[in-house]
Amino acid sequence: MILGIDIGNTTSEFGFIYNGKRINSYKLRSDHTKTVDDWLIDISAIFSIEGMKKESVKDCVISSVVPPLEDRIYSACKKFLGKKPLRIGKELKVPIKINYKNPEEVGIDRVVNAFAGVKRYGKPLILVDLGTAITFDVVNQKGEYEGGAIFPGIDSSIEALFSKTAKLPKVSIENVKKVVGKTTVESIQSGIFFGYISLIEGMIKRIIREKGFSPKVILTGGSGEIITKGLEIDHIFDMYLSLEGIYDIYSYHGN
């Protein structure tokens, strides 16, 4: 059993993972005001709620795209568990060839997804992660990371529309059925929901045309649960690819 921690820009997920499968996980806001002691209290509470003894966790493994939070959560885990956590990209390198002009630029979350995607679904792949940003990541027939595209996430777009317009309300995009809205709320919901579906489908078609292969399409991330319902292309939705991918890399290194 490991405690896998996926630190993102908006939320951080703490998950108990056994033999590559998530047992349970908890999402907390990625709060930059929290101290090491605040995170220590949160981690202790997660173990208490789960009824989990810290002795049952062999290692803590962290994947992070937020360095300041990574440092605090690392210190909190070290205090709580009495051992140093392992960090993806530092103690645990991601074993995948990166064909970016500057491989150091690629977010660790993207290469974790790429490695986990290949291990679980084969190759080639297009991975679409719907989080604070939407990332499109391409893995070629050799299992190499080719690159991709980045777009503002759904929640980011909703927040921008709400904050920069005087009369448009903030909306939820669950259960959107019709493209043509009959109210302002319905029109915004349609624009966001079907607009992003069209974006994703269009980008996937363009990537396939440009790269010249037929990949599996893997959808993941917080907003994926909503978007998967409307996509009209073959795809697999894997909510916990990023979290379970932490275990895949940990396991690869002989743990």
Curated annotation (Swiss-Prot):
The keyword Cytoplasm applies. Its EC number is 2.7.1.33. Keywords: ATP-binding, Coenzyme A biosynthesis, Cytoplasm, Kinase, Metal-binding, Nucleotide-binding, Potassium, Transferase. A monovalent cation. Ammonium or potassium. One of its GO terms (biological process) is coenzyme A biosynthetic process. GO terms for cellular component: cytoplasm. Belongs to the type III pantothenate kinase family. This is Type III pantothenate kinase. It comes from Persephonella marina (strain DSM 14350 / EX-H1).
